[in-house]
């Protein structure tokens, strides 16, 4: 029990301050529970460690219900190697823990100016952990849990968190931040993972992101499934954000200069989600892309075997769509290039259009529709262009004799049920109420 404020300092040899014995002084505190009614300062050692005694867990500080406002603190001051451990057991931090360099906390050249290591089977952080340099938390066979409103902060260095599973409710902040879980990782809506100057990397087998992740560049990777909840926000201040998973579901917001979404299986953007590549490229790469949310970029790329959905993908300058299987926009999917080119490749064949709107079509249907439409001489250029636009979205062979039906869906006529039917030698325009006007077409283009 620490009942008074205590400072444990390395001894000093007054006659020879360079003594190897003194300069390499180490301190080990072994205990099951370190109760603090006052602060504890450990100063000047080469190595200082607080470790679990015997075959026990280690608890530092006492549980508090006052939001830890009056919690006591353990300080490692000018200690080269600061460590808290419980080999094969659990560490619970109820007190504040920090490392400092009281002579010059900004002097990173000082040997006694390194960070803090916390190692155990399970690590539970119920209060703030602060280092003027680096923090390394390791629970490779267990769980790392951080409490809401707590902060793990490396002021001038990096934070590394490694665990089998992770449940993050507080803030993790450093110049760079790496959070790795070999199994599952959950970041709660209250959580914040912040890389102030560099990369924020979050890696797991399965990941559920409910909070905020930010950095100059951000990478979120799941070897299996990745889910971002509606409460989540993933932002990159001026760089790249990449999400990679076997299967992904995006319900929150993503905002970066460039955004890349990679899935080898299914990628779903949930209605209400918002993905922005503010000044660069939005790239969506998936086997099956189900796009129900809103996505935008200066340039957009959608590469998938199959694509469907009811959402909107908007490019300011250019859009590229490469679908090797089926493109299904019948539920309302819009892929739009506002001011530039929209290049569509369906099953390896390229068609240039301005936008893709609701409908279903195969590449063969599109090419045949455009070929036949060129024969219709009594249509104006505007009408022909309108039909050509419909070609990638609502043109279908409906009979085996190469009859093509275009469901114009308010694009060509004021009646939603209107149709244009083109078969060999004839094009018919129907208002949907039974009336139809037909014109003959020949291969030579003459009526």
State the predicted function of each range:
Residues 43, 50, 61, 84, ...:
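Charge-rich, low-hydrophobicity low-complexity segments
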Residues 1-3, 8, 12-14, 33-42, ...:
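Extracellular beta-strand scaffolds
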Residues 336-447:
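Extracellular/surface-exposed low-complexity segments
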């Amino acid at each position: 029990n620490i009942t008074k404020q205590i400072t444990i300092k390395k001894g000093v040899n007054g006659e020879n301050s360079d003594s190897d014995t003194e300069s390499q002084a180490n301190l080990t505190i072994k205990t099951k529970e370190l109760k603090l009614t006052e602060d504890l300062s450990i100063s000047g050692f080469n190595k200082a460690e607080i470790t679990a005694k015997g075959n026990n867990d280690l608890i530092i500080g006492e549980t508090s219900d006052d939001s830890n406002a009056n919690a006591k603190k353990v300080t490692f001051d000018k200690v080269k190697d600061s460590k808290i451990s419980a080999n094969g057991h659990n560490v619970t931090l109820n007190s504040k823990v920090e490392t400092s360099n009281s002579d010059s906390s900004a002097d990173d050249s000082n040997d006694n100016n390194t960070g803090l290591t916390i190692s155990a089977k399970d690590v539970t952080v119920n209060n703030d952990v602060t280092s003027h340099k680096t923090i390394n938390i390791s629970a490779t066979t267990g769980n790392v849990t951080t409490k809401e409103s707590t902060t793990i902060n490396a002021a001038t260095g990096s934070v590394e968190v490694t665990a089998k599973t992770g449940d993050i409710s507080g803030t993790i902040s450093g110049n760079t931040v790496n959070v790795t879980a070999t199994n599952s990782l959950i970041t709660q809506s209250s959580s914040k993972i912040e890389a102030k100057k560099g990369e924020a990397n979050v890696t797991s087998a399965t990941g559920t992101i409910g909070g905020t992740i930010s950095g100059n560049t951000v990478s979120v990777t799941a070897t299996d499934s990745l889910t971002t909840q509606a409460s989540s926000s993933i932002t990159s201040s001026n760089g790249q954000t990449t999400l990679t998973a076997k299967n992904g579901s995006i319900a929150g917001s993503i905002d970066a200069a460039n955004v890349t979404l990679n899935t080898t299986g299914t990628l779903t953007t949930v209605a209400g989600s918002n993905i922005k590549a503010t000044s660069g490229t939005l790239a969506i790469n998936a086997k099956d892309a189900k796009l129900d949310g809103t996505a935008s970029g200066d340039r957009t790329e959608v590469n998938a075997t199959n694509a469907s959905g009811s959402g909107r993908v908007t490019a300011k300058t250019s859009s590229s769509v490469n679908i090797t299987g089926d493109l299904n926009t019948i539920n309302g999917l819009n892929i739009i290039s506002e001011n530039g080119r929209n290049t569509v490749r369906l099953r390896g064949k390229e068609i240039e259009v301005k936008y893709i709107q609701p409908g279903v079509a195969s590449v063969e249907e599109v090419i045949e529709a455009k070929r036949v439409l060129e024969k219709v001489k009594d249509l104006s250029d505007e009408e022909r262009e309108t039909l050509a636009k419909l070609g990638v979205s609502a043109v279908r062979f409906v009979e085996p004799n190469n009859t093509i039906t275009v469901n114009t869906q308010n694009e060509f006529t004021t009646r939603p049920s209107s149709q244009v039917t083109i078969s060999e030698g004839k094009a018919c325009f129907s208002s949907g109420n039974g009336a139809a006007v037909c014109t003959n077409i020949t291969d030579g283009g003459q009526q």
